[in-house]
A protein has these predicted regions:
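Conserved SAM/SAH cofactor-binding pocket of Class I
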Residues: 60-150, 156-157
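Conserved beta-strand signature within the Rossmann-like core of class I S-adenosyl-L-methionine
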Residues: 167-173
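A short glycine-rich, Lys/Arg-flanked "PGG" loop and its adjoining helix->strand segment in the class I
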Residues: 156-166
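Short loop/edge segments at beta-strand edges and connector loops
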Residues: 46, 125-127, 197-199
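SAM/dcSAM-binding transferase cores
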Residues: 182-243
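Conserved small/polar residues in nucleotide/adenosyl-binding loops
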Residues: 244-251
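Class I SAM-dependent transferase core
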Residues: 3-69, 112-119
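Short "lid" loop at the C-terminus of a central beta-strand within the Rossmann-like core
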Residues: 129, 174-178
Length: 256
């Protein structure tokens, strides 16, 4: 089975329909990924068929976990080689996609991919905690997503400040997610979100790999103290036993 037919078939197994034209875009993306990976560190997965499932199909699980409104502003935090942002944009060309990463050379590669497959996306060279303090980016996205970037209590502090009221944060992770989510639940609440659901998936690979998408919705403004400095976020992450400092009335105000 060739790569395009493999993608169409495997995506169908998770309930996502990929058209031949979209499969062609994914093929170009994969070719560039594997070619550029020989000179820069983009992915540890170098087998084309494995990459189709563990990068492309895995990214597409987001479409089944979260209903994204038309023309939504979506930011992919710590996008790396473009997952899940670029697969999402291929399938949903209406969204306004922003790709955020701390390494500029990755963003150069992603701009090359976007040009090659004919999609538009904004690339931003910033650390996530810097983006969360930027008034042009803070609380301005309908959806923030991240794929296996960090533990949930750290990831939440990176991503939640970027989403607007009633927006969603979708975290994509492996089998550890349910335990991480329980541990981080109070931290997530302190940042302004409530956990809506956790959606399990089994990837259609030989290992039947287990994946989860945790969906959180923003119902309170994120207190201005978050995100903290990057070193503090990782050295002193917000734990389950977080002592929550009461925010201002504005921070507590719920959207109606």
């Amino acid at each position: 089975m060739d790569i395009k037919n493999l993608l169409i078939s495997k995506a169908k197994e998770i309930g996502v329909k990929v058209s031949p034209a979209q499969a062609e875009q994914f093929q170009i993306y994969l070719d560039l990924l594997l070619e550029r990976n020989t000179v820069m560190n983009l992915t540890a997965i170098t087998d084309p068929e494995e990459a189709v499932i563990k990068h492309f199909v895995d990214s597409l699980t987001l479409l089944k976990a979260l209903e994204i409104k038309k023309n939504a502003k979506v930011i992919d935090v710590g996008t790396g080689a473009g997952f899940p942002g670029i697969p999402l944009k291929i399938m949903r060309p209406d969204i306004e996609l922003t790709l955020l990463d701390s390494l500029n050379k990755r963003l150069v590669f992603l701009r090359e991919v976007c040009d090659a497959i004919g999609i538009e996306a904004e690339t931003i060279h910033k650390r996530a905690e810097e983006a969360g303090k930027d008034t042009k980016l803070r609380e301005s996205f309908d959806v923030a997503t991240a794929r296996a970037v960090a533990n949930m209590n750290i990831l939440a502090e990176y991503c939640i400040p970027l989403i607007k009221m009633k927006g969603y944060f979708a975290a994509m992770k492996g089998p550890s997610l349910p335990d991480e989510l329980e541990y981080a639940r109070k931290a997530i609440a302190s940042l302004g979100c409530d956990v809506v659901k956790t959606v399990p998936f089994i990837l259609p690979d030989e290992e039947q790999s287990e994946r989860f998408v945790a969906v959180m919705r923003k119902l309170r403004f994120t207190p201005k103290m978050y995100p903290r400095h990057g070193g503090t976020i990782t050295k002193k992450p917000l734990f389950f036993c977080l002592l929550y400092t009461s925010p201002s009335p504005r921070d507590m105000r719920r959207s109606r």
